[in-house]
């Protein structure tokens, strides 16, 4: 009996050590994925882990990139699909963004869970975008996006969590890898 208890204890200890290491490794993990015509570099959020910040480049022009980000919501708003193709106001690191973000996908996952994917406007020079984002990141030590209110739209109506942050450590290297 003692041997069985010892073996179970050792297995449990090893499982916890490996699990803890895996969780810590995922916090700083970047994903670089190649698709038919574009490459995506992505990072999980700190507030909501499943919400990703994605940088995408067309394989034919790796000098310009765009940004996609998602917000998951558990609010069961009956008109959440009405957000499709809308432009929503956002703040980045507390600064209002004039061009806002366009909703490109509203996807129901489960009965009460939806993912809303948005795109920051336009493709920008990789160099200029990385420099601007890293300046914001180094100033506050995070890169945060917040959904904000405007006349006719209150993000609290649709989203239970209206902000997320991402660590951008190693972003320049990951973009170079994606290029």
Residue ranges and their predicted role:
Residues 23-179:
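A generic "folded-domain core" signal
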Residues 1-25:
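Classical Sec-dependent N-terminal signal peptides that target proteins to the secretory pathway
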């Amino acid at each position: 009996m003692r041997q069985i208890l010892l073996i179970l204890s050792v297995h449990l200890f090893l499982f916890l050590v490996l699990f803890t290491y895996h969780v810590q490794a995922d916090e700083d993990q970047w994903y670089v994925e190649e698709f038919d015509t574009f490459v995506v570099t992505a990072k999980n959020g700190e507030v909501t882990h499943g919400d990703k910040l994605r940088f995408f480049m067309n394989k034919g022009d790796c000098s310009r990139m765009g940004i996609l980000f998602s917000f998951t919501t558990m609010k069961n708003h009956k008109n959440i699909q009405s957000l499709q193709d809308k432009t929503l106001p956002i703040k980045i690191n507390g600064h209002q963004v004039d061009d806002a973000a366009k909703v490109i996908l509203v996807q129901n996952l489960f009965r009460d869970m939806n993912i809303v994917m948005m795109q920051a406007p336009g493709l920008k020079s990789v160099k200029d975008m990385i420099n601007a984002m890293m300046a914001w990141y180094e100033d506050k030590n995070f890169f945060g996006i917040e959904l904000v209110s405007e006349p006719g739209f209150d993000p609290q109506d649709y989203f239970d969590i209206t902000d997320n942050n991402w660590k951008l450590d190693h972003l320049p290297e990951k973009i170079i890898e994606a290029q």
